[in-house]
Amino acid sequence: MSEKKINLLDLDRKAMRALFADLGEKPFRADQLMKWIYHFGVSDFEEMTNINKVLRQKLAARCEIVAPEISSYQKSTDGTIKFAIHVGEGQEVETVYIPEDDRATLCVSSQVGCALECTFCSTAQQGFNRNLTVSEIVGQIWRVSHFLGFAKETGERPITNVVMMGMGEPLLNLANVIPAMDIMLDDFGFSLSKRRVTLSTSGVVPALDKLGDALDVALAVSIHAPNDELRDILVPVNKKYPLQEFLAGIRRYIAKSNANRGRVTVEYVMLDHINDSTEQAHELAQLMKDTPCKVNLIPFNPYPGSPYGRSSNSRIDRFSKVLMEYGLTVIVRKTRGDDIDAACGQLAGDIRDRTKRLAKKRMQENQISVTMN
């Protein structure tokens, strides 16, 4: 039985250099190889013309460059593209490309499903199967870049920003997310600015501290409620890491960070008559008074079976005006890709749910139906 080949997309520069040392090669050879992979999108060692033939043969014998494949894609009327990415065992995660005039953002997944149970999120209702590997995370960027077209002559990449806001909670997969983001930031990797790579979290506080010790990227935090009582329902991880503990962790992170320029982005999904009253806006402003931030209000994007509705424009407007009275910077996110279920909270993929969450939900619904009948 032949030995399994090393997928080079799993290796950050430190690991890549260690591999080359094991091959008896100098560190700069690893840098050359990474440039071929991430700047020019090359996966065939024979195309790497500044690497000698003997080394190319060694690499071909021991290594491979394999990104997950695109199973299908849908294009929105606004230009947003949602990709279904095959990650084995019949499972898919979803990745979303969002083009704008001044940037091109890719929303990347970190898990097959999600282990958290946020009640307004479609991904959470699908359950959880496993963490994505480094190659499956960076492979989403690599594969979509291929789809959009690497600039072979200049090395210019078609993606300018990456947000870890797809399927999954990134802080529950730190072992793979940290090296993946290292590759995104590395000059020989995707060469993105730390201000153009954003990680979004629902508040796994110990892992947030570990992230802050490991690297510096922009941080977005999913708050979604102005108090623990409501957040316990909407974002159940709050029962383990309540708001004040989460906010203290956020302040520790931004104290270390240059990428955040001294403040964090607060994400707040607007749920009709659930968390969108003017009283709750005052409460949110008071909650955030000691945590430098800008607030991103996200109109809820319904999905089949969702128990919530989207706040009206007038309620969102009143809510935002209250926050601005406190001197907060407020942005109402423009919904992108909702006609193809690619908007915030709508990603579902195709998941073999190890948590059996959907099955349990259906059983509960059947029990309720029997009781009512």
Swiss-Prot record:
Say if the entry is tagged with keyword Cell inner membrane.
no
**Origin, by domain of life?**
Bacteria
Q: Which GO terms describe its cellular component?
A: cytoplasm
Which residues are involved in binding [4Fe-4S] cluster?
A: 114, 118, 121
Keyword terms of this UniProt record: 4Fe-4S, Cytoplasm, Disulfide bond, Iron, Iron-sulfur, Metal-binding, Methyltransferase, rRNA processing, S-adenosyl-L-methionine, Transferase, tRNA processing
Which Enzyme Commission number(s) are on file for it?
Answer: 2.1.1.192
Under NCBIfam families, the record lists: PRK11194.1, rRNA_mod_RlmN
Q: What is this protein called?
A: Dual-specificity RNA methyltransferase RlmN
Q: Which organism is it from?
A: Shewanella sp. (strain ANA-3)
